Amino acid sequence: NITSHLVGLFSRTASLMQKGIKPVFVFDGKPPELKQKTREERRALKLGAEKKFLEAQKKDDKEEMKKYASRTSRLSKEMIDEAKELVSLLGLPIVQAPSEGEAQAAYMVQKNKGFAVGSQDFDSLVHGATKLVRNMSISGKRKKGHTIGYETISPELIDLSENLNNLGIDQSQLIVLAMLIGT
């Protein structure tokens, strides 16, 4: 039985709680139809990575195996249910989004039901989150792309209105820009 997702979730959550942060966990609901093509593309990439992992395994190439192993991971419904149970046992709130979790979290921050969305993804800003916190890592490190190396990171608070003002655009223009670059 795989438990690494729970160990990681527990240690990250405990670290946040020790710092006085009470996270609210927002889980994705049904993905929008518009994302179906993207989901299929991601599935194909995972299958390709699995094939390359097996090829590297046959050659006993540990570096290539490690490189492709991380690209093959999947979250099952059981893993998500276990994560929800752990979060609940920690006494933290769980929100089940009707669709995309990023949109739900952004809405909650807009309505002052939370300080900021915690995510590496900028989508919550496109959905109107007033604040986004990135790089919430315990170790202060993050994997460098698809390499084996790591880079040092620090938490980053991004204020939507400040950035819109600096760019000289409004929220609707940010949405159009996001659509043009494909986020």
Each predicted region: which residue ranges?
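Extended two-metal-dependent nuclease catalytic cores across DNA- and RNA-processing enzymes
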Residues: 37-183
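Non-catalytic, usually N-terminal nucleic-acid engagement modules in DNA/RNA processing proteins
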Residues: 1-46
